[in-house]
Amino acid sequence: MLWSSLIALVLVARNAEAIHTLRFACSQLVTERLDPLVNPGKNPSPHMHQIVGGNAFNTTMDPSNDIGETATCTTCTFSEDFSNYWTAVLYFRARNGTFKRVPQIANQNLAQAEGGMTVYYISPDNTTSPITAFRPGFRMLAGTAENRKPESGFVNLYRCYDSYDENMFFKPNPMGIAATDTTELPKSFCGGGIRVNTFFPTCWNGVDLDTPDHKSHVAYPDRGAPCPATHPVEIPQVFIETIWDTEKFDKSLWPEDGSQPFVFSQGDPTGYGHHADYVFGWKGDGLQKAMDARCDVYDASPEPLIFPPEGCPHLKTQSQKVANQCSQRQVAVEPLDEWLDALPGNMPITYS
């Protein structure tokens, strides 16, 4: 739904003239305070996350385990994608100082998904080398939770929707120009929700499946340039999209001064600290085959599915109804949908 407005950004970043896109839904697996990438083994972790993907998600996510082989179900459309994707959670702060979790809206043409995210894997045509799919044990982090100002080489893109209709067509038209996108949380009331897209790096050093900071083994190329010599291997452009249902929180609940009332679970009211984690978990070599074939899959249509094998014969799909049945109970058990006196974990709100 939004991908064409982001194509220019991806093209410039990857210096490509044509790209191919896998776009699919991943409904909610669980929402809880666990972060096995940044805080492995810690229960609970400092702030709340929304998690989608395979049911092998756990407190530690031991990198020696191939989660593509250990997971038994996934919330994603592609039934061989047992990867896990997670981001911070958006909260509304009312004028009386209490907080409530903002739910997600399923994406256009993916409306059967129960909240969650839309996931994109993008590969260009005119690349100097093949696109190398990730390997078991690979993981990475995009963004920095502590940021309150723009981060060099990384952006989130936000869009404020005025409304949407019964067919989940959003206004303003998400296929339009990216001029309405911002790199910080919108400051106005968004009756159709707030969309946020988070982009992962596209270059890898070809050696390390992870590094202590979960970033140094990957890199963003300079705009219009190929991958740097330090990270010469081109990997798929992964980005994830969430639409937060901000319409439920009308202006009567906003702070009396009209200031922006939304804050991410790590205490970020700016949006610059929004971040995402990725742990690879595709089964077998399906993702590599899809990259080699430059598969294009944009929509998950109502059942029966009309893409794959036509869209990408190398990948297997499942109905969204089946995907929605894959879920986990909270390990770090705490309330999700009540009004709270503080952000989960008593995370302080910081502006710098």
Task: Map each language-model feature to its residues.
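Fungal secretory targeting signals
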Residues: 1-21, 352
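Primary mode marks residue(s) on the alpha4-beta5-alpha5 output face of response regulator receiver
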Residues: 19-45, 50-198, 205-352
